[in-house]
Amino acid sequence: FSPRFAIPGLSRLDDRDVRLMLLHDQATDSESDQRVGDVRLMMPFTVEKPGFSVGPNIIRAWVNPYGPSGVPIIERREAHQIIDDVYSTIALGCVALPKVLVFPDVPSDGPAVSLLRSVAIGNGLPIAMTQTVKRPVLNAWQDSEMYFHEALSGHHRRNYNRLFRQLGERGDLQYQIARSPDDVRLAMEEFLLLENRGWKGEKRSSLASDRYRGAFAREAINNLAQQDKCRIHALTLDGDVIASLIVLVEANRAWTWKTAYDESLRQFSPGTLLMMRATETLLDDPNVVFADSCALPDHPVMTRLWTETRDMTTLVVGVDPQLETEVRKAASQIELYSQTRNLAKQMRDRLRTMVKRR
């Protein structure tokens, strides 16, 4: 929800009406009478029905395939009072918003979730947690050599070293990191071209295949680069980009946001080789203590390279003590919808496998 990342996507990534919840001070400038209060909380959200569109409406913190986290931005100072104010304000009858809040894809052990839960419990508000999955993460407390020695078997380490050596025999193989705004701008265009040449381009799911997604990605990444909050890692072969990885950084944390590789070289696993180099960089960077893969729980590459996981869950909060039934129903609808989607995906994948065999 970093403003430089989220705001470019509000009107470009979702057909729904995405609104912006802000809590700020009401201090005024005596000369201009303009409100100059600091923002204490920011959260994009949608108003919708949970799961299969059954039951009362909910306030859902906005998540999307390009922002898989529903944690609102909360000012650390007086954070408990801020959340208490949010709950009590939404509970007012004069506020024309649903009275059930849903925070999807939030770390169950994170400080924000602990805060949201503790304030709710302290006020006797009903809560539920559902749709818990494990996401690959990286705790950067080891050096890279020790980490890979423990994370990968000797067979896999030798295999990846062999692939890197064989790829280097085809030309001048280089690992590069774009960090300055100008370098990031150029590397971003190379990423978009590389991703669009692969299967995502064929299925029209690449960033560049949709002008709104492309505009969002360019603006968001270039905005972050202006504040030194973006790195684009790349493998190049004779000067041509064959794998690219966009990493977002904030304070001492990193997110491996998007990756693409040259599918004509898939036998060398350039995407995996790049992720290994990027992992080494993250582990050896004293300014990074934690990295989020932003990956699905069963991601074939990240679950192998990053052996640690973090529980990601959906937190449901009712802003009135009498809403326990509504909270329970919303949580069960969300869980049922998730299970049904996963089952449909498994069936679709099996059908595709059967068709390919024929």
Annotate each PLM feature:
Residues F1-W62, D105-Q267, R357:
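A conserved beta-strand-loop-helix scaffold within acyl/acetyltransferase catalytic domains
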Residues D25-D29, K49-Q131, L248-V317:
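Acyl-donor binding region in acyl/amide transferases
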Residues A79-Q81, D143-E145, Q322-E324:
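Short helix-loop capping/hinge motifs at secondary-structure junctions, enriched
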Residues Y87-T89, E150-H156, R328-Y337:
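Short intrinsically disordered coil segments
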Residues K134, D182, D298, V319-Q322:
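Residue-level detector of flexible, active-site-proximal loop/helix-junction positions
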Residues N139-A140, V317-P321:
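Short beta-strand-to-coil "C-cap" segments at the C-terminal boundary of structured domains/repeats
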Residues Y147-F148, T303-L305, E326-K329:
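Short conserved micro-motifs at the rims of enzyme active sites and ligand-binding pockets
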Residues V319-R358:
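Membrane-proximal basic amphipathic "stem/tether" segments
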